[in-house]
Amino acid sequence: MPTILIKFEKKTMKTFFKIIGLILLAILLFFAYSIMNPASPLDRVAFENDKVTFEVEYSRPFKKDRLIFGNKSDGALVPFGEYWRTGANAATNFSINSDITISGIRLMSGKYRLYTVPGEEQWEVFINSEADTFFAITEPDSAKDLMSFTITPQQLNETVEQFTIDFIPSPPDGPSSTGLRLRWDLTEIVIPFN
């Protein structure tokens, strides 16, 4: 082969590998940015007293002028009567370090998955043993549901822009339970536990 052709091939190969390297770097930077700055950021909340530590890990989507809860035909983001992972991105998981009672049912210490089926009049809440499933975006295995119960949603007076889970203390004149509160848009549910 002539020397000129060999030099040309080496230069072409170097350029080719540089371009491939830049493309791979751009893809890597895009994924790193997406993980570090998700549209629905990851959050953790915790409740602790002398009996239990209750920690929840979930992603917090924004309303962004969308219809959140409603009929599928109206374009609701979370349609009534359908599975919702109760957050965004991956499943909502929680852990408890000692046994608690939820809706009259005893739940042993451990890690769990929380999901819901919102409704206009009632929400179905499910506790599932399928926790920490990597990027669990599909419906969980219902055979692993440990309990389910219904909660009546409450209408809020002010819009909650970002999906929020927190804990509220029991009312002074009410039952001796704490509430796991879920709020988004104009809807709130409280899951009492003790």
Where do the model's predicted regions map?
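Ser/Thr/Pro/Gly-rich low-complexity linker/stalk segments immediately outside membranes or between
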Residues: 34-56
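N-terminal Lys/Arg-rich, disordered targeting/topogenic segments
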Residues: 1-13
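Mid-length scaffold segments of soluble, non-membrane domains
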Residues: 86-137
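Surface-exposed, gly/pro-biased binding rims or lids
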Residues: 133-177
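Short, exposed beta-strand-loop hairpins at the edges of beta-sheets
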Residues: 177-185
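Short extracytoplasmic
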Residues: 50-79
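Hydrophobic membrane-insertion alpha-helices, especially the h-region
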Residues: 18-34
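Structural motif
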Residues: 49, 102-103, 184
